[in-house]
Regions:
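C-terminal cap of thioredoxin/glutaredoxin-like
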Residues: 2-7, 11, 20-26, 34, ...
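Short, contiguous strand/loop micro-motifs
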Residues: 59-60, 97-98, 185-186, 274-275, ...
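Soluble or luminal CAZymes and related metallo-dependent hydrolases
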Residues: 102-106, 190-194, 279, 317-321, ...
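An N-terminal domain-cap segment
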Residues: 30, 35-52, 56
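Conserved strand-turn element in the central/C-terminal portion of the radical SAM core barrel
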Residues: 59-61, 126-127, 270-276, 340-344, ...
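Short boundary motifs at domain starts and secondary-structure transition points
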Residues: 42-49, 256-264
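Structural alpha/beta surface segment adjacent to cysteine/selenocysteine redox centers
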Residues: 60, 66-164, 282-374, 465
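Short active-site neighborhood of thiol/selenol oxidoreductases, capturing the structured segment around
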Residues: 48-64, 78, 82-83, 264-278
Length: 467
């Protein structure tokens, strides 16, 4: 059996050893191998005399794709690359656990992203199926039968996508009515083969979502990861003009806390992490900055890792998560180095001590140490000697704390935390919840790349309450 098949079985059923799992995770997140691969790919491209080709994968039913297509014209004008636009189907269900929640979350998330980056998102519901069919048919016609410049095709794509998300068909009817007689004959009989090439390419490139770019063995998801692609192209001197370094600017907001009466603050931030998540690991530093910088109450609410909740993570998704988390971590000065995945008994032991440690005020510090051990030092957090040293380093009594290893109360606590997380339409980590004490107000965000939304909301509330 090929190793990839073993990996596939492993990530859903835990059928290979932890040592193999840990090595694969380290390979996928290795900073050294990451940059070595970039050098190797550029040498290969030069040897094969290939142009710089960036692939973009668009899905008409994906709200993130609607946002991303709006920056394509800027991208083409800014970089000396060949952009190939391909179309893809919805991802397989194995990549989207909790599918209905996933769809609802994406709609809400895309709306937030659009407002933050000055993009347009016209609707808060999925497009109608009959409109999707017509939209793909029109694009299929222009893609294969009509002579059109790439810029004009991008403008057409934005026009079609906007109409689709508005659930209006006037634009479609206008386009179809503009066809000549022969064009209408071709249009009426044309088979829709638009998705075939895109689906095959996306799979070959080891990815699964639309709204993504691919350049020389590396995937970049939507406007969120566009900065990584732009950095790489700029390093290759492919920027056409001396302009802003990024198409999407990630503005930072600041708030003056000097004259604030902190006794009046009633904001609370809840942080939902899990011990096997590289995205959670790279978020701890920024989460700490939030509760140290802003006058908010803070509580950490750990949950079980997805794999310990019987959720499947296919190997291609696991590989992308590790490589992307490492790439994002480097952006914030947090390195993934040696990995020891705590799935199973190590996580259970470590979690069992959390309630008493948290009651003593060290819950966040404890989990932060565990995450550093899992993703930087490569230590087994389930070993008794490790736990004893970690507890002692926190200034706590090991003889008292270790008694909780016999207690199963942590299971109920983590399950309650999970239910709270699900209440906000989130099933993955890290999740953050901002709330007002003695109020029904709750604001959820999921993902280390959404921490800035929580910060922005805190600032907005503080500015409103304290002009």
């Amino acid at each position: 059996m090929k190793i990839i098949n073993k990996i596939s079985n492993f990530f859903s059923k835990k059928t290979i050893s932890s040592s193999i799992r840990n090595k694969l995770m380290m390979d996928w997140s290795s900073e050294e191998k990451f940059f070595e691969n970039r050098i190797k790919r550029e040498k290969l491209r030069l040897f094969e005399k290939r142009p710089h080709i960036v692939y973009y994968f668009h899905s008409l039913t994906d709200p993130y794709s609607h946002l991303t297509c709006q920056i394509l014209e800027n991208f083409v004008n800014k970089y000396d690359v060949e952009l190939k636009i391909l179309f893809v189907s919805d991802p397989h269900n194995v990549f989207t656990p909790e599918k209905k929640m996933f769809e609802d979350y994406c709609l809400n998330d895309a709306s937030h992203i659009a407002k933050y980056h000055g993009l347009k998102f016209e609707n808060a519901s999925q497009p109608k199926e009959k409109n999707i069919v017509i939209a793909y048919k029109i694009l299929n016609f222009y893609f294969f039968q009509k002579e059109i410049t790439q810029i004009d095709f991008i403008k057409l794509l934005i026009k079609i996508s906007s109409s689709l998300w508005l659930n209006e068909t006037d634009t479609f009817n206008e386009i179809i009515s503009s066809f000549g007689e022969k064009e209408k004959e071709i249009f009426d009989t044309l088979e829709n083969s638009l998705l075939k090439e895109g689906n095959n390419k996306l799979s070959d490139f080891g990815y699964y979502f639309g709204s993504s770019f691919h350049y020389e063995d590396e995937n970049y998801w939507g406007v969120d990861r566009l900065n990584h692609l732009e950095d790489r192209l700029s390093e290759l001197n492919l920027r056409k003009e001396n302009s802003q370094p990024y198409i999407i600017n990630y503005s930072q907001n600041n708030f003056n806390l000097e004259n604030l009466d902190q006794g009046q603050i009633d904001l609370k931030v809840d942080f939902f992490p899990s011990l096997n998540s590289p995205y959670t690991y790279i978020s701890f530093k920024r989460i700490r900055e939030i509760f140290e910088k802003y006058p908010v109450k803070f509580e950490v609410k750990p949950v079980l890792p997805m794999l310990m909740r019987n959720m499947k993570i296919p190997p291609v998704k696991a590989k992308y998560i590790l490589s992307d988390a490492a790439r994002e971590g480097r952006k914030y000065g947090v390195i993934i180095k040696k990995i020891y995945s705590p799935i199973g008994k190590p996580a259970e032991r470590a979690y069992s001590l959390f309630p008493i440690i948290n009651d003593k005020g060290y819950g966040f510090d404890y989990l932060e140490k565990l995450m550093e051990s899992c993703f930087f030092y490569g230590e087994n957090i389930g070993e008794m000697k490790y736990l004893e040293k970690t507890i002692s380093d926190l200034g706590l009594s090991w003889s008292e704390i270790k008694e909780e290893l016999k207690n199963n109360d942590w299971k109920k606590l983590l399950n309650n935390n999970l239910n709270e997380m699900y209440k906000g339409g989130c099933w993955g980590v890290p999740t953050l919840r901002l709330s007002k004490i003695n109020s029904d107000y709750e604001y959820y965000q999921w993902g280390q790349d959404r921490i800035h939304f929580i910060e922005k909301e805190i600032i907005s509330i503080l500015n409103f309450n304290h002009p």
